[in-house]
Amino acid sequence: MAGHSQFKNIMHRKGRQDAVRSKVFSKLAREITVAAKQGSPDPAMNPRLRLAVQNAKSQSMPKDNIERAIKKASGGDVENYDEVRYEGYGPGGVAIIVEALTDNRNRTASNVRAAFTKAGGALGETGSVGFMFNRIGEIIYKPEAGTAESVMEAAIEAGAEDVQSEETGHHITCAFEDIGEVSKMLEATLGEAESIKTIWKPTTLAPVDEEKAMSILRLISTLEEDDDVQNVYANFDVSDEVLAALSA
């Protein structure tokens, strides 16, 4: 069975790679600036900034771009961004959480609501679908970081809660509040991670057919194209057959 991560790969293959990369860099830079403004500009002293910089590096964001985003936080004309979470239902009753960093709540809310409505879904109140997800930390290592056994051992020692080792890499999860310490201990043993972030993991999945899957794909794509939207999470599940049809 498959879900959002595979859909993101499909979207990136179908879209213009340069445009996708530019959009990703813009969102990463915004998160870095907000993190630096809220705490120390030194990643070693600011856990949120450290995670933001690490993710930027994993996406091959140039060092100059990262440093520029950090320096922007100390400028007098830097925008004030609010962290906002939207929740609602998409096609097929799929629960969706949207995280945004915005300098205009009205604009972002209007755009998100319009995207849901156009897709045949509905934007709800905060908390309307959040209970279907758990907020956790996710740390991803490339396959060459170690064997399944060695990574499992390192993860247990670091205080992680679960490890899934596959051909594509090692996916380590931990409690939301422990991600800073767990990732730091893992780095000492396994080296630099490919990705370190907090996510909303669904507790239950909603199976969808190809038609509904296409509608969800379009909705997620529309949401992620919005400059204010940082992350989109959904609890849909598609069969391997449907995923193959979408990938064609």
UniProtKB/Swiss-Prot annotation:
The keyword DNA-binding applies. GO terms for molecular function: DNA binding. GO terms for cellular component: cytosol. It comes from Bartonella bacilliformis (strain ATCC 35685 / KC583 / Herrer 020/F12,63). The keyword Nucleotide-binding does not apply. It holds the Pfam family Transcrip_reg. Belongs to the TACO1 family. It is found in: Cytoplasm. Keywords: Cytoplasm, DNA-binding, Transcription, Transcription regulation. InterPro entries: Integrase-like_N, TACO1_YebC-like_2nd/3rd_dom, TACO1_YebC_N, Transcrip_reg_TACO1-like, Transcrip_reg_TACO1-like_dom3, YebC-like. One of its GO terms (biological process) is regulation of DNA-templated transcription. This is Probable transcriptional regulatory protein BARBAKC583_0163.
